[in-house]
Amino acid sequence: MSDDPEDRMLGWDESVFRDEHVFEIDWLPETFKHRDTQMETLKYALRPAVRGSRPLNVIARGPPGTGKTTAVQILFDELTAQTDVKTVRVNCQMDSTRYAVFSRLFAEIFDYEPPSSGISFKKLFSQITDKLVEEDEVLVVALDDVNYLFYESEASDTLYSLLRAHEAHSGAKIGVICVSSDLELDTIDALDTRVQSVFRPEEVYFNPYGQAEIADILGERADRGFNEGVVGPTVLDRVAELTEEQGGDLRVGIDLLRRAGMNAEMRASRSVETEDVEAAYDKSKYVHLSRRLRELSDSETALVEVIAAHDGQQAGDIYDAFSEQTDLGYTRYSEIINKLDQLDIIDADYTNVEGRGRSRELTLNYDADAVLERL
């Protein structure tokens, strides 16, 4: 290669990326590293379904970005390809009510959406179970981000309907995998006793990845996604270090690699340097926040904006400002506060206020400008 700097620069029609899709969150790796124990437990729980029986129920818990959803997707792909077991993954951030969950199940089972109105839950439920019995299929449902059902007080009713399906319709066989990233949520204790008695799940914990594991996993992505020689070991180690600082959330590291590659291209460079990683980090470290903010309703987003403008004030004072923008009552306002607190977007700690007793003080857990930029 020529020593001329111009020859080492990217041309307009060139890229550092070999396959940029590798850096999408939904890309499934060919090898799922450092999760053998978790995968074996999941396979153990689902094995009865392959024999035509109801599988064991499962709770998969762990911090964000530790492979829970990937594990479910890989197992579901294997079951679908090799067996007659029906699998459905429900994103509970999007489908956060019992009716929405069963509408998703209906759509996946029948390959078309249920009527948008005029169909009761009872009829929706019976059509799903009728189909399962008619086809003699076992259904495994993954409630991904199940914590969102708890935030909306829908978890117990949803799980009760799924777990008692065989009583409502003889022959219906349904197993449930609950996937939760909220480590402060005790899933079992938060359920009604009527659900606790029938749930009895296997528990699988996805621990945070260590720095060496992060480097190993991201190294595979880098090899697949970048052209040869674009990312060196020093850069990869720095990405792994920054990812571990964010709790080992692989989504941070994956996004960081992609943005660092884009920064290298902006410099017309054929290689990613540490400076590209550092410049990308300010955005990549908020990937988890961005994901949570995208799923908020209009009223929830409006409250986040108000809290950003009145950060650290009392809940009553913030409600006065919030009520000027919406017609929601204080009860719904309190419910939204609880949800934002559970999502770790805000802290809502009780404090003693002179002359007013105990009141909640609402503070953002992130820089206000960073939050507002992502709304």
UniProtKB/Swiss-Prot annotation:
A GO biological process held by the record: DNA replication
UniProt-listed Pfam families: AAA_22, Cdc6_lid
Alphabetic keyword roster: ATP-binding, DNA replication, Nucleotide-binding
GO MF terms held by the record: ATP binding; ATP hydrolysis activity
Record function comment: Involved in regulation of DNA replication.
Family recorded in the similarity comment: Belongs to the CDC6/cdc18 family.
Record's protein name: ORC1-type DNA replication protein 3
Natural source organism: Haloarcula marismortui (strain ATCC 43049 / DSM 3752 / JCM 8966 / VKM B-1809) (Halobacterium marismortui)
Protein encoded by which gene: cdc6c
